[in-house]
Amino acid sequence: MFWADQLANQAVVRVEKDFAEGKINEKCAVIRCGQTPSGGKHIGNLNDVIRAYFVYKSIKEKIENREWDGKVKFIHTSDDRDPLKDIPIKIMDLNWKWHESKDLGLEKFLGMPLCRVPDPFGSCSSWSQHFTKVWVEGIKMLGIEDMEIYYNDDLYKEGKFDLYIKAIFEKREKVSEIVKKFQETKHENYIPFDAICPNCGRLANIDDLNNNTVKFKCGGKEIKKKKTEGCGYKGEVKISEGKLQWRYEWPAQWGIFNTTFEPFGKDHFEGSWKSGQVIAREIYNIEPPIPFVYEFFLVNGEKMSASKGNVYVTQDVLKILEPEVLLYFYTKKPEKQRDLTLAEIFRLVDEFDNVEKIYYGAENGRTEHETEDAKRMYEICINKKFSAIPKRLPYVFASTLSQIYGEKAIEKVRETNKKAGQILYDDDLAKIRLEKAGNWANLYIPEGERIKIIDDKEAQKIYLGLDNKIKELLNKFAEMGVENLSGKEITLKIGELIKSSGDKELSVKFYGACYMLLFGKEKGPKLAGFIDTLDKDFIINRFKAE
C-alpha cells in the first residue's frame, strides 16, 4: 500500500477513536503542516506541505468514495512570530526574481519577530507577509488549493495560545523537569516564553507572569548561538504580546487545531518531537498527532541553505518542470535521502512519463507490485485526469528542438504529427514541455555543451574527412526521401541501409558521422526523431556529396 494511504488509514482510525471517547466534537481529521517565513523557502521545505497534502488527498478520496463519513481539513501555519535569526544571502521579490541582501541594512532587525520586520521590497505589510505570499503562490502553482492558512501572530492576538501560555506558568516545576531532561544548557528557572519589547520590538526573556501580563527586562536573547542586543527597557506586556519558544509552541499548535497528523523532518525527531510529546501530555493535557518523519534531500549533491544562498524555491523548479512531475518526486519513499540533480532533471521527467504510461496501461512495471505502486503514485500527484493517455514530447527531444528552433519549435512538432498522419504529441502539452525543457537548457547546460547545428562550411570539412564507405551510405540516405517519413520509419530505413552494406559494424560509424555533420559532436539526440524535423534541401546538402 502507498505510504500516504497507510497514514490516511491511521488518521481515520485515530479520529474514530477520539470521537468515540468524546475527545473531539466531530469526526474531522486535521492534517497540518507549517513553515517559518524567514526568507525564500526552498523545495526541501515543500516536504512538509506535500507529504501532508498527499495524506489529506487520500482521506478526501475516502470521503468522496463514501468509504468514510467524516471530514478532513488541510491546515498550514505561518510561524511569523519567530525572530529574524539571520539574513539570507539572497531574497526573492514578488516577481520571483532573486536579489542580493547585503546592502539593504537588514541587520538592525535581527531578533525582531518576522511579522514586525518591514518587507525589504516595500510590497507587503511585513517581511513575513512577503515571504509567506511567495511561498503560498508556489504551492498554488502545484495545484494545491485546499490549504487553510493561519498566522501565529493572529493566533496570539486572538488569545488562542493563552491557555497554553498559562499552563507553563501553572506547572513551573514540571516545566523545570522537562528543561533539565531536554535542554541541559538552560538554567533551572528558565521560562520558555519571550515578550516582545514595546520599545525596540525585539524578543526578550521574561521574569514572571502576573495575571494576563508578563514582566520583563529587554536584555536581548541568544538566537542561533548569537546574542541580540536588548534596549534595557523594563515593564509589562500582555501575554498576547509574546511568544512561546519553539519546543512549547509546536505542541500548543497541535492543541489549537486538534491536529491528527503532521509530517516533519528528521532534525525535529531527535529534539523537538521527543520533548513535544512530553510537553503535550504533561503540560497541555493533549495527545500528540500521528507523526511522520521524512528524510531530507539534496540538490546537486548539497544541502540547501538560505543563509548560504544555494536555495531553489518552487517557482525556480517549475521553470523547468511541469507541476505534476515535481509532485511525483515527493511520492517516492520519504525515509530515503535523495539527490535532485538539476543538470540531469530529464531522468526524473522520463521516469514520470513512464509511470504515466503504466497508469494508462501502455506499459507495465517489472512486477505486479511495481505496476500497482506506479499507478497510485501517478494518481495522487496528478491534478487533472485525462480521458486517454497524454502524448507527451520526450524531455530531451523537447530540449533539442527548443535549443535549435527556439519559438518555432512547436511548428516542427506539428510538422512531425502531420508526417506521421496522427497525433504523436499533444499540442498543448508539447508547448509546455518545449518551454520547460528550453528553460532547462538555458539554465543548466553549459553554453559550450548546448546543441546547435553547425554551419555548412564546418560540415563540409567534416564530410571530406569521412571514410568512403560512410560517405556512400550518407549519399544513399540523402536520396531515400526521409524528409517525408516519420521518425519510426526513418529508424527502419537506417536499419535497412546498414544491412544492405553487409557490414553491421558501420552502424556506430554512420550514426557518429550524422551527429558530426549536424552538431559537430559524436553524440546527440535520437537521430531519427530529429531528422524528422529537417527539410529536404537541408538533408541533401548536409549528407550528400556535391
Model-derived regions, located:
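A short glycine/serine-rich beta->alpha loop
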Residues: 35-43, 259-265, 498-502
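Short, conserved helix/loop micro-motifs enriched in His/Cys and acidic residues
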Residues: 32-39, 251-258, 492
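Catalytic adenosine-cofactor/nucleotide-binding cores of aminoacyl-tRNA synthetases and other
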Residues: 268, 273, 283, 295-442, ...
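Active-site cores that bind ATP or allylic diphosphates and position pyrophosphate for catalysis
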Residues: 145-315
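N-terminal Rossmann-like or analogous alpha/beta NTP/dinucleotide-binding catalytic cores
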Residues: 1-176, 276-278
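A generic secondary-structure signal for well-formed alpha-helical elements
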Residues: 56-59, 63, 139-146, 172-179, ...
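Basic, alpha-helical terminal appendages of large translation-related enzymes
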Residues: 1-26, 41, 64-69, 73-75, ...
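Short, solvent-exposed loop/turn and secondary-structure capping segments
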Residues: 43, 85-87, 180, 207-209, ...
